[in-house]
A protein has these predicted regions:
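Active-site scaffold segments
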Residues: 177
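Disulfide-bonded cysteine-rich modules in secreted/extracellular proteins
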Residues: 72-79
């Protein structure tokens, strides 16, 4: 039986951690945290502050279940799982589920306006940014500089799909190890670990030599069509479950 499911945007033995030169994505023991090695960020062209988006075929699997696809029903019968149950869905995803990652794309409102999101800042960072941008803020609000206060300042930036990356170093540029947070995908990719999810680093190999294209929605609607852009996706494949080092497990 040749069940296949298309990708769309989303969302074993233990050993010591492998070299960071390997192209890997790690779902860390720290809840929601992911790590990318420099080998991956270099090929994907990621710098700190860029976003990473997960791509999967789970939506297509769910659609096939909802439509009672004949091949899916037959697979469940052949594998002694009751179609329509959570156990059947979990078995289908475990068998046929595939995941990948891509660089996030700029997002728009339905009418084509650039989508903006709030910027997280400490009180000190916000105060400093307010002082530097007083004139621009006043102009945007149609007030004088003397009239505005820091409460008038709501820092925003352009929205991108996916989760924003960061680095623990002061370096910048392509090829750095990066981290990001995605609680939904962390839970999904570590679901079968149960209570051990926060005790294990789950490592995935990133197939850098086998990129493929997937259409990702931008949020803009043109006529009756949702705008999409083609992105390069790199498939991730389970490699190992590993015990975190003392430094990695510190929270």
């Amino acid at each position: 039986m040749g069940l296949q499911f298309g990708f769309s945007a989303v969302q074993s033995g233990k050993r010591v951690m492998q070299s960071s030169n390997e192209p890997t994505l790690t779902a860390n023991s720290t809840k929601a945290k992911f790590s990318l090695t420099g080998a991956v960020t270099r090929i994907m062209g990621l710098v700190p502050g860029d976003t990473v988006q997960f791509i999967s075929n789970v939506a297509d699997i769910d659609a096939a279940i909802a439509e009672r696809d004949a091949e899916v029903v037959a697979w469940c019968e052949a594998n002694n799982v009751e179609f329509g149950t959570e156990a059947a869905r979990a078995a289908l995803i475990q068998t046929f589920g595939e995941y990948g990652i891509c660089k996030g794309v700029p997002l728009f409102e339905k009418d084509g306006k650039v989508k903006l999101v709030g910027v997280r800042m400490t009180a000190e960072q916000k105060a400093a940014a307010f002082e530097l941008n007083k004139e621009k803020i006043a102009e945007e609000l149609g007030k004088s500089v003397e009239e505005i206060t820091i409460d008038d300042y709501i820092p925003v930036t352009r929205a991108y799909s996916g989760a924003r990356t960061s680095t623990s170093s002061n370096l910048n540029g392509v090829g750095l190890p990066l981290t990001f947070s995605d609680s939904s995908m962390w839970n999904e990719l570590k679901e079968n670990l149960g209570e051990d999810a926060e005790k294990i680093n789950r490592v995935f190999e990133v197939k850098l030599n086998e990129p493929f294209s997937v259409a990702v929605e931008t949020g803009r609607v043109i006529g009756d069509e949702k705008e999409t852009v083609e992105v390069s996706v790199y498939k991730i494949v389970f490699q190992s479950d590993e015990e975190p080092s003392v430094r990695q497990s510190a929270k």
